[in-house]
Amino acid sequence: MVWVNGKYVGYSQSSNTDAEFDITDFVTTGDNQLSVRVYRWCDGSYLEGQDMWHLSGIHRDVYLVATPKVFVSDHYITSSLNSDATSGSMSVKLTVDNRNIVSATKTLQVTLLDRDGKEIATGTETYSGKATAEKTIKLSSLSNLHPWSAEDPYLYTVVVSQKNENGAEEMAFSTKYGFRNITKSGNLIYINNKRVYFKGVNTQDTHPEYGRAIDMETMMKDLTMMKKANVNTVRTSHYPRQPKMYAMMDALGFYVMDEADVECHFNQDLASNSSWQTAVNDRITRMVLRDRNHPSVIFWSLGNESGSASTFSEARKKTQNLDDRLIHYEGNMSYSDLGSSMYPKVSDVSSNKSGYSNKPYFICEYAHAMGQAVGNLKEYWDQIEGSTGIIGGCIWDWVDQSFYDPARLVKGERKSENGFNYWVSGYDYNSTSGINYGFQGNFLNNGIITPDRTWTGKLSEVKKVYQYVKFSDFNASAKSVKIANKYAFMPISSDNFEIGYRVMKDGYLVENGKLDNFTTINAGYSATVTLPINTAVDNSAEYLVNIELRVKKPTNGAADWTTWAEEGYSIADAQFSLSEQNTSNGTAKGTDGTMEFPVLPSYTSAGGQLSVTTAGSWTNKTYTVSGTDNNGKAYSIVFNSSGKMTSWTYDGKNLIAAGPDFNSYRKVDNDRNFSTTFTNTTSMSVSSSLTKSGNNATMTVKGGSRYTTVYTFYPDGTVDMKVTFSSSSSLARIGLGMQFASGFENVEFYARGPRSNYSDRKTGSYLGRFTTTVDDMVDEMIHPQTFGDHEDLRELILTNKTAGVQLGVKVGGRASFSLSHYDEAKWCTSGDSMWNSKLHWYDLTRNSQVYAHFDYMQRGLGNNSCGGDGCLSDYVCPSWGSYTYTLRFKPQSAERVNIPTE
């Protein structure tokens, strides 16, 4: 509601749609007073039931615009491209308003400029009269046009000017515009005559400090991160965005599904009431009139979760009268040009590969990204890219919507002493029976990235699955790789890319190179490229090569991607094995898929002395292995009567706080529909007593029916743990948990990284050698849950700098690991406290010891926090059979404190 100088001007509804007020008759010369009242709730609120914070206030820009009394009040640009996509025409419909009462004559001019400001064409029309009128200026026979696409977002400038009878310019403005065609043929969508896959995300206006008043810097941060992650489509769920964001999407290159501010959510039958027709039409019409000049807008969406009523039939007709773009509405396919669904399973997608409701199939929401999520994304896109009628989809959603606790923020407090953000969720506000129908608990936090826009393991997976380049058929002997260009328009050329490679030996970088010049690979084609790799490969180590397509400053008029990515940024990549033991007929396996698990060679101790003792009897019995290594450092390992390791020291320093035992603790948001039991202990027993044989010693311990561990002790202090798990029920994880002593903070690992990854979310995480700290391995979700897994572990090195001791772990067989200072038992309970409580990371106690998991397998993440798949069968922990890995521990003095990062 608006007043000027105390006089009422007008009122508007729709919190996320622009409103204009003519205040000409209310202003006076000099200072004026503008007053605004924002109603938090009104009847329009029933059409704004989106999954978001419902906050009060003005959260977008307010402008004051002055015009002549006779002025161009609207302009509508349309164009068409010929089949060659480089020639066509443009029409600009101008609406002229005359507020002067008397007749006037004006010259209207439209000028088309290219990116460099060169005039391409111009045209004029004359307005004469005193009534509102429309005039159309046509620019025909345009040639040598540069078409717009998300891959190459070339923008022209359309300048509109108005001159008086004497030729003096009275007003002028410009609009950025791109030439592109949108066509539907069969059950596919084409941009400029090319089939396009819409690789998208749903978005919200959210900022952890400013709430819904998102600033330009954050908008640009979001969009550049999306581009870097190969996202090409944005659904403005579930309301139009600020105009500035559309300008950014035009310039950076995105396909946009522009969605009206209409969502009934819990009250979807509202739309069946014809009394809402005018309100629905108003919201959709205002969106279309504002945004129809943006080339990035490909689809109009009539709203979300508002039922199937005929209200949207009328809204569709209104939209078609204003613009001819394709229309989407998931609630009723008869009002939509697209078939659409939310949260299908992979099998559902597979069964609709030729289309949905006999229309192009667009999955408007899928892969619900709440918490530790985005499992089996690859399987979705295997189906989509192998289809004849699926055009893509949008992940729900881009960013977690939590904000800083307002009570702490006003005191300048954003982080706890342990470095966790003071983020809150719907659970922190007046819930009823654990459910808040205004803020829906944690259902505002479904983001791929965190509220402060931190890159996550989820986003790494999206980047990999969404990438437009496929590397395959790597020949380890010839050092050649097949590169398939899956872009719709963009050639892979040395004009704008370089092909880089990095060779690693057991995770350490041994060779780094690039190709600056290579044969151009046009969109839709493939070529084989040979890399000048010089590294000699043998069977003494694992050799891997990372191949990357890197962005560089363009030449010869190529599209400039350095506007959103730094030079050298890898926009697409793959990893292959160079090792002979992983090679068959010269063709190496890519590490995107099934890996060869490492094999530990037999071990011979390089010196040292070992002794074993058994003391006490019955429940007081202890088993001790002690000795000195080849450097004269003493070690001791003690087991209690049941075989539980109770002490392990090296050079007088404690290595453990608790010995290994079976541990099945695992809980993430996607597990809410998965029922399992948790345990971190078993009924252990010594089945084969501690015995020395030659220079070595052995002991066998049974952990009830869960597992058996065969220990082998070597004189130099090395310990092998060969663990065989016996699975008899479906669990969330199968593995051992243990606690390392305080001080083992520095971490080096040779596994998939650098960010967390899981069995069904690891294609975007490559094998490498990474350094970090235990504290930095936390995935800071809004609510605590299992985190930090790293698949395909080869080696782990923990360093206690203060004590000057280091503990190395090498792996034989399949294994993953995670490390933490936090006890998972705090959120992995038999109840539902993880989801129905105010538990935050900053509420948890950081313990000094290091909680470690060594898993044979952890259940895949799936995407079942809302619809979708709980976990595909390939990633479910087996419920029967025996499974083995070996962990080889070796303590030593901490001489390798400064560890290479590659």
Which residue stretches match the model-derived regions?
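Aromatic-lined ligand-binding clefts that engage carbohydrates, nucleic acids, or primary amines
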Residues: 1-5, 34-36, 106-109, 490-492, ...
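Beta-strand-rich ligand-recognition modules
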Residues: 3-33, 37-51, 130-149, 213
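Extended substrate-binding grooves/exosites of carbohydrate-active enzymes
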Residues: 7, 12, 19, 43-46, ...
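An acidic-aromatic loop/edge-strand motif
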Residues: 15, 23-90, 98-100, 173-179, ...
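Extended acidic/polar, glycine-enriched regions
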Residues: 28-31, 93-183, 546-551, 562, ...
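Solvent-exposed, conformationally flexible loop/turn segments
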Residues: 29, 87, 128-134, 518-526, ...
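Beta-strand/loop-rich accessory regions of lumenal/periplasmic or secreted enzymes
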Residues: 40, 149, 532-540, 555, ...
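Carbohydrate-binding surfaces of carbohydrate-active enzymes
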Residues: 94, 99, 384-638, 721
